[in-house]
Amino acid sequence: MKIKASVKPRCEKCRIIRRNGRVMVICENPKHKQKQG
């Protein structure tokens, strides 16, 4: 999980979602998981 100021999808499998008011990227590849901080 990376904490970034701006989250961007890194591949075509990445999905941008909102959880508890936070923007997150979830993906099949665990290295692509990101959370906005």
From Swiss-Prot:
Any one GO molecular function term: structural constituent of ribosome
InterPro entries tied to this protein: Ribosomal_bL36, Ribosomal_bL36_sp
UniProt KW keywords: Ribonucleoprotein, Ribosomal protein
GO biological process: translation
One Pfam family, short name: Ribosomal_L36
GO cellular component, one term: cytoplasm
Listed NCBIfam families: rpmJ_bact
HAMAP family referenced in this protein's UniProt entry, alphabetically: Ribosomal_bL36
PANTHER family: 50S RIBOSOMAL PROTEIN L36, CHLOROPLASTIC, LARGE RIBOSOMAL SUBUNIT PROTEIN BL36C
Family: Belongs to the bacterial ribosomal protein bL36 family.
Protein name (record): Large ribosomal subunit protein bL36
Lineage, top ranks: Bacteria, Pseudomonadati, Aquificota, Aquificia, Aquificales
